[in-house]
A protein has these predicted regions:
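Helix-loop-beta substructure at the N-terminus of cytosolic sensory domains
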Residues: 20-70, 262
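Regulatory loop-to-helix N-cap segments in sensory/regulatory domains
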Residues: 134-172
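Alpha-helical scaffold within the catalytic cores of cyclic-nucleotide enzymes
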Residues: 249-263, 284-323, 327, 348-359
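Catalytic NTP-binding/metal-coordinating core of nucleotidyl cyclase/transferase enzymes
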Residues: 213-295, 343
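Regulatory sensory and allosteric helical modules in signal-transduction proteins
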Residues: 67-129
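Regulatory cytosolic signal-relay segments
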Residues: 165-219
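Short amphipathic alpha-helical segments
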Residues: 8-16, 21-36, 112-116, 168, ...
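Catalytic strand-loop-helix junctions within cyclic-nucleotide turnover domains
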Residues: 277-288, 323-343, 359-362
Length: 363
């Protein structure tokens, strides 16, 4: 039976995956296992794509024969490393290359990237990179990677003669269908990243689950957090924009960062104020929510002392802030006008916590 006939069930399965929303790690692992089962001699495979996330520029699934596939993420600053600069993946991205094959042994041996020498030392004999460009996909916003978007898969074999022509044909035939299935999953992941980054986890999930109309929402008991930066108007008027933003982010890292570290959720940055909640379901969880909120407050105060000592040592302006906490039921949902909404909390508990915070100015 031909390779094309052997891999047809895999292609059909990938079409089904594209119509679903599978776990991308499991999908890649299963595809690799099915390819090896029909005789394609892969022993190492990597799936790489760029994402849209405040921390990560790219994600990759790592599969090695006999092991479970795992997901790894690359920070934005990782693209400046020497390893990346000398990577075949960077070459493929920057030169819009769709197929790159390197034989690692024999008369056609080509080791023009450092990783190829490493793979040869590990016993690999053949290396293949397949890239599928996806229009209307995401971009990192990095001008150095403009247009560098799509799905990249690398395959490596340790069979003595490497990949046969039939193997190469099979992998290239599967690539486009697999890229389509990946696009479905990746766009869903990116939507979740964007929703949770700008709305928070709870609000993001609610919106993605269909609560998109004005008035959609829920009632929930919560410990509500409201913090506000002192003298922000004076700082904004007297400081250079870059200096002011640096202070503002240091303050947000101190307050919102502590809130998140203790299980809270940031709902909104209102100018230089932070609005967040520690939700709980019933009275049995109230004490835990209060303890988490108080622990977050303690951490924020400790962090502010550390940051202000460092800022004073470097001649920078120190910052101060107030925090108010309140417990009660809040209305959590969509407010605004039909075509422009904000997912936030409203109610007397929120109004009270803002007034409580303002009282810290008198202390």
């Amino acid at each position: 039976m031909s390779h094309q006939a052997l891999t047809r069930p895999i292609r059909d399965w990938l079409v089904d995956q594209a119509l679903d929303n599978p776990d991308i790690v499991k999908m890649f692992e299963t595809m690799c296992q099915r390819l090896t089962a029909v005789g394609v001699p892969i022993t190492r495979a990597r799936l790489i794509w760029q994402t849209l996330h405040p921390l990560f520029r790219a994600e990759t699934v790592i599969w090695d024969k006999g092991k479970d596939a795992v997901l790894e993420q690359f920070l934005h600053q990782d693209d400046s490393t020497d390893a990346w600069e000398r990577s075949p993946l960077r070459y493929v991205l920057h030169n819009d290359v769709q197929v790159l094959r390197r034989e690692l042994q024999g008369p056609n041996e080509t080791l023009d990237f450092p990783i190829l020498s490493e793979l040869k030392e590990q016993g690999f004999t053949d290396y293949l990179v397949l890239a599928t460009r996806i229009d209307h996909a995401i971009t990192t916003g990095d001008p150095n990677l403009a247009g560098a978007r799509g799905i990249i898969v690398t395959w490596a074999s340790d069979r003595p003669n490497g990949f046969s022509n039939d193997d190469l044909d099979s992998l290239q035939q599967i690539q486009r269908i697999f890229a389509l299935a990946c696009k479905t999953v990746i766009q869903s992941r990116i939507s979740t990243n964007i929703a949770t980054t700008y709305l928070g986890k709870r609000a993001g999930r609610s919106v993605l689950n269909g609560q998109i109309r004005r008035g959609d929402g829920m009632h929930t008991p919560a410990v509500v957090w409201f913090s506000d930066l002192r003298n922000s108007t004076a700082y904004a008027e007297s400081m250079a924009a870059e200096t002011y933003f640096s202070m503002l982010n240091a303050y947000f890292e101190t307050t919102a960062g502590a809130l998140v570290n203790h299980g809270g959720e940031v709902l909104d940055f209102i100018g230089d104020a932070v609005l967040g909640i520690f939700p709980f379901e019933d009275e049995t969880q109230l004490e835990e929510a209060v303890l988490r909120a108080n622990s977050a407050l303690d951490e924020a105060l400790a962090l502010s002392r550390e940051k202000n000592e460092a800022r004073a040592g470097s001649g920078q302006e120190q910052f101060k802030f107030g925090v108010g906490l309140n417990v009660g039921e809040v209305k959590f949902g969509n407010i605004g006008i039909p075509q422009r909404l904000s997912f936030s909390v409203i109610g007397h508990t929120v109004n009270e916590v803002a007034r409580i915070e303002s009282m810290t100015k008198l202390l």
